[in-house]
């Protein structure tokens, strides 16, 4: 089968398309024919081994897992003898951070992994693009216990995580202020934001409004810069480690004291998570944004584009010849 592999760490150019052996499902696995996957920031980080600490999990000198890809959607091609929840022909989607392997024509997935039957109202492209951004957004929203009527600011509202967060927060009844660049103001308003700040013309950290939660979905600000935006017991959330890395450290220290604090939740990857996302897709409370589509043969170009930092929502890799 065809797959995108990397046998060394580095820039997008370390990735190449080659033929590899077809995986075989064990008794407790399903074999999925991939129709769509994505290139996301997790793939970029593991490919480049940045931060360096990732090497302790992926291989100190060279990657142990050569095929990346965390999000997928496709059809079940075969099932192991012990599999009861899925059958051949099922349309499935899921998330496999840690296992990887979705940047290929076929993938084996344990029956109890983060995989579910696709909602009938989404395409393969949409299903593949629905998991990483929304599950990071959900993990943070749940950790902060955000509820109806609260004021929340989302920085990076056009990214995969930020665009999901805006939609999910509105479905909860929160009042959402979103931060994005000029050209995307109408888009973010359509996502449901009550108010939009154009970071090209205004510094959002100088905003006069205060918030119950500031969610830095872009990971480009800091608790220090955003602290003045928080109400007395407000919460700062970030999807990035921050320098040194400060955000996990602050998440350990700040809850020990009264007042404003930092939370840095570690998302759970299980069937409950993907089932929750399925429900959100079915209810139309969430729809992933898709920026560009590339065929597998052009995955290096997809990596380059993602690393410009200019993508909107998600970048999808199509394995069925469709890039429209």
Sequence positions of predicted segments:
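Glycine-rich beta-strand-centered segment in the early N-terminal region that forms part
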Residues: 21-38, 52-99
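NAD(P)H dinucleotide-binding glycine-rich loop of Rossmann-like/cofactor-binding domains
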Residues: 61, 70-71, 78, 85, ...
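Short glycine/proline-centered loop/turn elements that form peptide/ligand docking sites
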Residues: 80-82, 176-187, 220-223, 242-245
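N-terminal Rossmann-like NAD(P) cofactor-binding module of classical short-chain dehydrogenase/reductase
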Residues: 93, 197, 212-215, 237
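Mid-domain Rossmann-like dinucleotide-binding core that forms the NAD(H)/NADP(H) cofactor-binding site
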Residues: 127-198
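A short acidic, Gly/Pro-enriched loop at the edge of an enzyme's catalytic core
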Residues: 205-213
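Glycine-rich phosphate-binding loop and adjacent beta-alpha segment
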Residues: 220-283, 318-324
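C-terminal hydrophobic helical "lid"/dimerization subdomain
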Residues: 270-324
